[in-house]
Structure formats: C-alpha cells, structure tokens
Amino acid sequence: MNVSTYNIRPIYRSHRLIRSRSCFCILNPLAVRFYSSKNFSSSNNPIANSNEKSSHHDEKLREIIETTNFGSELRKKKEMHDKKLHEQKAYEKYEKEAEGKETPQEKGQEEDSVSNSDKSTPEEEVKANDGSIIASEISEDIQREIGNLPSQKETRRYQLSKKLEEYLDSLQDTIFTATRALNDVTGYSSIEQLKKSINDLEVQLKNEKDNVKKCKDLYSQAILRRSLSQREINELLTRKHNWSPDDLERFTTLYRNDHVNEQEESNTHNALNDAESKVDAIQLKLTQSILTRYHEEQIWSDKIRRASTWGTWILMGINLFLFILATFLVEPWKRKRLVGSFEDKVKQAIFEMSEVQEGKWDQMILQQKESAAQQSVSTLKSWWFNSDDDSEPNKSSVYPMILTPVDNSWQGLKTTIRSHYNALRSSTISTLQFEKYEFAWFATTITILGCALGSILTVYFK
C-alpha cells in the first residue's frame, strides 16, 4: 500500500469537514503529511490524478490555517527557522572566504546548492513539521473543547490501572517485607530454612533410592553373568574328554572372564552397599530433621501462644484501666464540667433577667415615688392655703403620710407638721397611708421616744 492510497480517505474526510465547518478545522495527521509531501507523484498514481482538482482546496485549507492563531505562531516559528538557516549559511560562507580556498566555480555551485536547498529541503521540513504541529495542536484543542472522548477515557483508564498496579506491587512488597521481619523477630525464619533443608533431603533421598535400584540391577546382572559363565564352565568340564579346539578356546575364554566377572560382582556389591549406606544416612538425617522441625515448631507455637496469652491479658488490663478511668474520672469530670457550664449559663441568664427586672422595678418605684410626692405636695399646698380660711382639705378618705419635709428647710418642716396636724383634725380622712420606709422610720422613732420617756418616768418616780 503506497502513501497516496493510504491517505486518500482521511483527506477526503478532512475536506468534507473543512467545507462544512469553515470556522472549525479538523485535520488528520496523515492528511497533513500527504499535503506536505513533495515525493508524491501524480503521474504514477491514478488516484492522485483524480485528486488534482482539489488543489484549490489545499490552498484554501492553508489560508484558513494561517488566519488562525496556530498559523500566526507557525509563521513566526518558520521565519525564525529560516533566519537561523540563512545566518548559518552566511557564517559558513564568510569562513570559507576568509580561508581563501573557494573558487568562483565552487561559489556558483554553492550558491546554486544553497538556493536549491533553501527552496526545497527547509521548506519541505518546515511544512512537514508545521503540518504535524498543527495536527497535534488542533487535536488537543478538539479534545479540550469536546471532552469525554473515548480516547481520553481510555487514557485515563490506562493511567488509573497503571497507578493501581504500581500501588498493589508496592503493597505486596511492603507486606512481604513486614512478614519477613516478623518471622525474623519470632524466629520462624530458621524453621523455614529447616523446612527447606528437609525438602532438599527428600529430593536427595529419592535420588539415592533411584541409585540403589540401579546398583541392585547392576549387581543382579553381574551375578547372572557369573552364574551363566560358571554353568557353562561346568558343562564343558563334564565333557572334558570330548573337547574340540573350539571348546578348549571357549573354556579358556570363560575361565579368563570369570575373574573379571568376579571383580565386577564385587564392585557392584560394594557400590550397592555404599548406596544403601547413603540412603540409610540420608533417611536418618531426614528423620532427625523432621523431628527437630516438629520440636522447633512446637516451641515456636508455645512461644506464640504464650505471647498471645500475655497480649490478651495486657489488652484486658488496658481495657479495664480505661473503663475505670472513664467511669470514675472522665465521666464525673465531664458531668461536673457540663453541670458547671449549665449552672453558669443559668446564673448568667438569671442575672441578666434580674438586672432587667430590677431596672424595670426601680423605674416603676421611682415613678410611683415621684407621683406620690407630687400628689402629697399638691395636697399639702392645698391644705396649707385653705387652713387660713378654716376650710377643710380636699375631701378624701385616704391621706398619704409623708414624714420627710417637702424641702430641706425650717419652713418646709413647719409646713409638713401643719399639714399632718390638719389631716389628723380632719373628719373626712379615715385612713392614713404610710410607705414601708416611712412607716419603719416612724415606728422606730415612736419606739425610741417611748423607751426614753419610760426610762425618764421610771427614774423620776423611783
């Protein structure tokens, strides 16, 4: 599959998207590479000949891209790249001219090559790079604008699974390290080594038993060969007087091989004995290792059981201590603190309420006193001014007795005494009204005067 046939369907799809959405360009990276490729030959590809009509779409696509922000940025990058290339070529040319090794023909060739390279290679590279950059940036912009695309979900899922896998691996390593440290502390690592040595001994015992079987087979074969040789020798000896030259040669061979068979039988017997002794030694060692393992495991289990028992007792003691502490110290302290805070809040509320009520009561008492004082003053004035005309006070059945003078002067005191005297003489007043403070003061004064008068009379008439 060549480049043109591979990229023609994405190009057609990109053209349709561009023509349908003039303000929203979607480019396929393969299509961009197709546009920027200069090696594509339309004469060798019939599909390319059918696409020559869409050349104006390429120009339109390029114009749309260049009018966007991506196109302006790419133009700046392209200008910077071309400027660097020209500066590098000029610097190299200046160095060659300074060295004086350049001929006019070489200069012409170099200028032609520089111009051709400036026209072909940099432009192709820049266009290819521009196309790939534009495609990647537009693809990222599309993904950011739309969001929740299948590729984004797959990428997030892959990252999440990778993180989860790394976390599980680290957790497994941590658990393995903690288990190994716990085994080292409790002494179970040596038991594990003992179990491993027992497994090795079992494998070794199996191999040695196989070796014993092989040695037994070899020993039985050696015995069989020697017995057959001796039987044949005995048969030849029974007909010794009828031997032929072949029988004589056969007897000589058998007699010569009998010593070899005897040596082979002895060697196989010794090998069998050695193998059996090895099996017995390994079996004994294996049995002893198993007993040691069971003994060590019993000791380890007893130690763990003892530690677990002590741990249980310690936990029970801690729980009992915490229960006692919570029951006899923490709970009373919390209850006391709660009650104290509640009492403080109640006291504060009562104090605030009492202050409010006292303020109201003081205000009410002050108002009553002011009203009573004003009423008494008005009554006293009316009685005083009406006393010269021998007129009675304002007809009222209740008279407020105020012992304090109206003003702190002798005239005020005389006015108060005279008003009280007129009230006592009045026939319309049937009730004298005292305030609590005034009555207490009046009763105290009368009591003191009575006691003083009684004492004087007692002393005088004694």
Swiss-Prot record:
<keyword id="KW-0472">Membrane</keyword>
<keyword id="KW-0809">Transit peptide</keyword>
<feature type="coiled-coil region">
    <location>
        <begin position="188"/>
        <end position="222"/>
    </location>
</feature>
<keyword id="KW-1133">Transmembrane helix</keyword>
<dbReference type="Pfam" id="PF05546">
    <property type="entry name" value="She9_MDM33"/>
</dbReference>
<feature type="transmembrane region" description="Helical">
    <location>
        <begin position="310"/>
        <end position="330"/>
    </location>
</feature>
<keyword id="KW-0496">Mitochondrion</keyword>
<dbReference type="InterPro" id="IPR008839">
    <property type="entry name" value="MDM33_fungi"/>
</dbReference>
<comment type="function">
    <text>Required for the maintenance of the structure of the mitochondrial inner membrane. Involved in mitochondrial morphology. Causes growth arrest when highly overexpressed.</text>
</comment>
<comment type="subunit">
    <text>Homooligomer.</text>
</comment>
<comment type="similarity">
    <text>Belongs to the SHE9 family.</text>
</comment>
<dbReference type="GO" id="GO:0007007">
    <property type="term" value="P:inner mitochondrial membrane organization"/>
</dbReference>
<feature type="topological domain" description="Mitochondrial intermembrane">
    <location>
        <begin position="331"/>
        <end position="438"/>
    </location>
</feature>
<keyword id="KW-0175">Coiled coil</keyword>
<keyword id="KW-0999">Mitochondrion inner membrane</keyword>
<feature type="region of interest" description="Disordered">
    <location>
        <begin position="93"/>
        <end position="134"/>
    </location>
</feature>
<keyword id="KW-0812">Transmembrane</keyword>
<feature type="topological domain" description="Mitochondrial matrix">
    <location>
        <begin position="460"/>
        <end position="462"/>
    </location>
</feature>
<feature type="transmembrane region" description="Helical">
    <location>
        <begin position="439"/>
        <end position="459"/>
    </location>
</feature>
<dbReference type="GO" id="GO:0005743">
    <property type="term" value="C:mitochondrial inner membrane"/>
</dbReference>
<feature type="compositionally biased region" description="Basic and acidic residues">
    <location>
        <begin position="93"/>
        <end position="110"/>
    </location>
</feature>
<protein>
    <recommendedName>
        <fullName>Sensitive to high expression protein 9 homolog, mitochondrial</fullName>
    </recommendedName>
</protein>
